[in-house]
Amino acid sequence: VLLAAGNGVAQQNYSKSEGLLQYVDPYIGSGYHGHIFVGTSVPYGMVQLGPTNIHKGWDWCSGYHYSDSILIGFSHTHLSGTGCTDLCDILIMPLNEIRTPRGNQDDIRDGYASRYSHANEIRPEYYSLLLDRYNIKAELTATDRVGFHRYTYPEGKPASILIDLREGNGSNAYDSYIRKVDDYTVEGYRYVRGWSPSRKVYFVLKSDKKIEQFTAYDDNTPQPWDQLKVASVKSVLTFGNVKEVKIKVALSSVSCDNAAMNLQSELTHWDFDKVVDMSADRWNKQLEKMTVETDDEASKRVFY
């Protein structure tokens, strides 16, 4: 089954992975009708943080398809291998130009979407991608309930991120909310009816850089308040002329307060590489529960 779902892409550089994790190829199943999520997570984690394409039908059930080359951001929940379309909640897109329309597959120039190539690095504990349009390097990792982002911006333009609470995979929010809590914290939620009749996803976002400007949008119309509750909430956070921004996004299905507690219990520091190493250790321990003895490297990659 794994061979049938695989897309035959070349192996990436897994030199940083050790143990059985070095044999994992996250691209297997991301083409054809595989419906496999591509991104980063920990075993059985609530967060599956990874790239999201514009939804174009059944082959995009996970929010991503290997044939695609247009990215609308990084969302924190993805289905994998289900054949059903849903999730892709709490979409984050790093920007150095303020844009709030999404854009479309045929012409992205009027929106925030960006082209990308597959010359990136992906392992279960780490995902990295260069946004061609903005020349921004994105790096992602995760704990159980927290997505950890590290963005490196080119010089000369203010560093920003877009939060799109309307956008989902095949289903848009019917209610959403965002609030600036302080100069480093934003919270909100997204209510959606999709394949699941009703889902509620709450989040708290913290940045390591001061939010110099917070703008909430009703779809693409800016609003003058530090909080907003409408069906199509978007927000742009601007950090000024900084080289690097780290953000942590904690999730809860209960409340924003619970999301804040999840963040406090799982990730109080800002050491991105430490979280990558922690995730790698957890994956290796999980993979070590079953081993295969063979000298065939390709068979190991298919198995793991």
Identify the meaning behind each predicted range.
Residues 12-304:
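Accessory carbohydrate-recognition regions in carbohydrate-active enzymes
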Residues 1-12:
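Bacterial Sec-dependent N-terminal signal peptides
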